[in-house]
Amino acid sequence: MTDLHQTYYRQVKNPNPVFTPREGAGTLKFCEKLMEKAVGFTSRFDFAIHVAHARSKGLRRRMPPVLRRRAIDALLQ
């Protein structure tokens, strides 16, 4: 028998998070520019450098898992 916990295990509740703004809420131009720059931040070299720096200081042991990085990207939007 297969263990059900291994078959359906996920690291996050929503594996494909998406930012959805409120209806009727406007966004400032400055915020829109920041959101455009933040798209895909966790998959770029900059984020890898931040993680490497945190590892050198002893704050992290490894790069966050892919699903957690997707959640971070959604939060930056």
Swiss-Prot record:
UniProt miscellaneous comment: This replication protein is compatible with the repA replicon for the IncFII R plasmids.
Alphabetical keyword list: DNA replication, Plasmid, Plasmid copy control
Record-annotated membrane-spanning stretches: none
Annotated protein name in UniProt: Replication initiation protein
Source species: Escherichia coli
Top-level taxon of origin: Bacteria
Protein function: This protein is essential for plasmid replication; it is involved in copy control functions.
Organism placement in taxonomy: Bacteria, Pseudomonadati, Pseudomonadota, Gammaproteobacteria, Enterobacterales
GO biological process: DNA replication; plasmid maintenance
UniProt keyword Nucleus present: no
